[in-house]
Every structure is written in structure tokens, then in C-alpha cells.
Amino acid sequence: AAGAKLGKQQAGTFGDAAGFSFYPTKNLGALGDGGAVVTDDEQLADTVRAIANYGSEVKYENKFSGLNSRMDEIQAGILSVKLKYLDDDNTKRKGIAQYYLNHINNPEIILPEIINRKSDSHVWHLFVIQHEMRDELAKYLKARGVQTIINYPICLPLLPAYSRLKHHENDFPIASRHQKQILSLPIFPEITDEQIKHVCNSIKEFFVEKNTYIR
């Protein structure tokens, strides 16, 4: 959500602290795994820095049970350069998302909905559609050179880590339905206009071949 706003407030300024992922596919991404914690609390910042450095503020004097979560200089340098282009890249993402919203006009497809307030700024890390024939559509698009992905294919309560709680799909009917229908379309600043059109046309062709309604 780097660069997103709710009203006049930037993402990362809600609460005592916030975390940003710098995974390569994020809006502000490094060339490998990385992330940051932001806060305006100096004491909390010192604690987080120590935890990320084996739990020590002074070498070999471990104040906390910590981790090795320090970002290396190469990744930091790359992010420093990419940060200059974040607003421009987010503007491109918004344009791509708007094209999808305007041209994927099959009523059988559930498109993402946002509250359209001028003071807010959605930065479209993902563009996720939903359809009950998700797997067939993904296979069809792949055959036409369109890479899609299923982000978070298992809802949290059904993960093996929580099997001890003995949850069932019926306990979470909405989340369980979504996990079977969600599909993320390509959205990144470098995608070309022709590639975006190809994505939309391929989706239309899929439904034409399936003899389902499409305008």
C-alpha cells in the first residue's frame, strides 16, 4: 500500500507503527525479500531496530530475543532509487486498473469495488477479479500468454497451522467462496497498452467460447 491514502492520511501513519513489505512485486519492491517498520515513537523504533539486529543495541549485548532482519546495503540502495518513481508508478497502476474496470464488462465477472472519494488514493497493488470458473479462465489465459496468479488461495482459518481449531469451510462461507473464485490479473507499471488490451480481449474470447453472456 505504499503511496495509498485514506483521506489526507498516508498508509503507514495509522496507529503506533506500520509495516511495509518490499517484496519484488510490491508497489515499492526490492530485488529480494525486505521490509520496514515505520513509527514516530523513538523508543519503539529503538526496540524494533534492536530486535532486527539479533536483539542488541550494542554488539554482543543482546537485550531482546531477536532476529537477523537487517536490510543489506544493495537492497537499500535500490529502494532509495525506486522511491523517487513511486508516485509515477502508482499513477500508471491506476490507469491500468481503470482500463480493466472500463473494458472487462461481463456481468458474470465480479470486479473490485472501491469507494470513489476524491480524497482517497488507491494504488492497486493487485487487480483481483472473481468468477466461479476461475481455474478454467486462468488456464485459458495462460495458453494465450497472460500470466495470472491466485493470491492467498486458502483462507486463514483453513491453513494447516490452525488445524487444531478444527474449522470447516462452512464456518466461513464468504471467505471460502472467494478463495475458489479470486484471480489476479497482470498489473505493473511496465505493462504495455497492447498487453493490457490483450488481457481484456482474451477474457472476452474465453466467455464467447464458453457461450456465456458478454457485451
Show where each model-derived region lies:
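Short beta-strand-to-turn element immediately C-terminal to the catalytic PLP-Schiff-base lysine
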Residues: 20-21, 35-40, 80
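Residue-level recognition of the GNAT/N-acetyltransferase active site
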Residues: 23-25, 188
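Short, hinge-like loop/turn segments at secondary-structure boundaries
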Residues: 10-14, 37, 166-169
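PLP-dependent aminotransferase class I/II
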Residues: 5, 40-215
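Glycine-rich phosphate-binding loop of ATP-grasp-fold ATP-dependent ligases
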Residues: 27, 31-36
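Glycine-centered loop/turn positions within well-structured domains
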Residues: 9, 26, 84
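Conserved PLP phosphate-binding loop immediately N-terminal to the Schiff-base lysine helix
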Residues: 1-14, 18-21
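Hydrophobic transmembrane-helix microenvironments that flank and shape a buried ionizable site
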Residues: 13, 30, 69-70
